[in-house]
């Protein structure tokens, strides 16, 4: 009798179009793409379909600028990925899959101060409002992702700038707000949720 092992997760895959509503030229990505113009021949990206996995999209080449989480599904125009973000971007120019080794047991610890100092709080669930759950400050000085991948937002209700925080990048350690992302100018985080695969 042979034993069949369970299949692993499907590889990350997304398709990009240079026009809204999945029109125009397209390009399929299966791995990191630092510049979709050079690799895929697209001058801009106006619609996206995530077929497998979760992805982080950046408004500039080389994984720079505002981050946008793209989970499985269709994004027919810029408003679908910008949502209620405080920053609206009608262009996405670099992409990478989210590294998420252990989503089923996601854990993150928030710290009041930089370098993991001060009051701390461990989370294992989604929180649409950190202040309402007892976090006294509007800011998070540092954080450690023990497992999984998270997306933190500037404001309650999953609004404002997005920061994708993964256990498998930076060893899960973000010593100060500037390590949250290239666009991070403040440690203001007021809601956080697990990345959905």
From Swiss-Prot:
Keywords: Eye lens protein, Repeat. GO terms for molecular function: identical protein binding; structural constituent of eye lens. PROSITE patterns: CRYSTALLIN_BETA_GAMMA. One of its GO terms (biological process) is lens development in camera-type eye. Gene3D superfamilies: Crystallins. Residues 1-11 are annotated as: N-terminal arm. Residues 100-105 are annotated as: Connecting peptide. SMART domains: XTALbg. InterPro entries: Beta/Gamma-Crystallin, Beta/gamma_crystallin, G_crystallin-like. Residues 12-52, 53-99, 106-147, 148-196 form the Beta/gamma crystallin 'Greek key' domain. Belongs to the beta/gamma-crystallin family. Crystallins are the dominant structural components of the vertebrate eye lens. Has a two-domain beta-structure, folded into four very similar Greek key motifs. Homo/heterodimer, or complexes of higher-order. The structure of beta-crystallin oligomers seems to be stabilized through interactions between the N-terminal arms. This is Beta-crystallin A2. It comes from Oryctolagus cuniculus. The gene is CRYBA2.
């Amino acid at each position: 009798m042979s034993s069949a092992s369970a299949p692993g997760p499907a590889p990350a895959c997304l398709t990009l179009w240079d026009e809204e509503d999945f029109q125009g030229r397209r390009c399929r990505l299966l791995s990191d793409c630092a510049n979709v113009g050079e690799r895929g021949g697209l001058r801009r990206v106006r619609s996206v379909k995530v077929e497998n996995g979760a992805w982080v999209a950046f408004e500039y080449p080389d994984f720079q600028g505002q981050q946008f989480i793209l989970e499985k599904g269709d994004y027919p125009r810029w408003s679908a990925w910008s949502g209620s973000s405080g920053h609206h971007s009608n262009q996405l120019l670099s992409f990478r899959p989210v590294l998420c080794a252990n989503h089923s047991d996601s854990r993150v610890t928030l710290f009041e101060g930089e370098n993991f100092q001060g009051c701390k709080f461990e989370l294992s669930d989604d929180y649409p409002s950190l202040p309402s759950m007892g976090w006294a400050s509007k800011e998070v000085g540092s954080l450690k992702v023990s497992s999984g991948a998270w997306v933190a937002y500037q404001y309650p209700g999953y609004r404002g700038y997005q920061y994708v925080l993964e256990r498998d990048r930076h060893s899960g350690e973000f010593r100060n707000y500037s390590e949250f992302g290239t666009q991070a100018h403040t440690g203001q985080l007021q809601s956080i949720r697990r990345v959905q695969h």
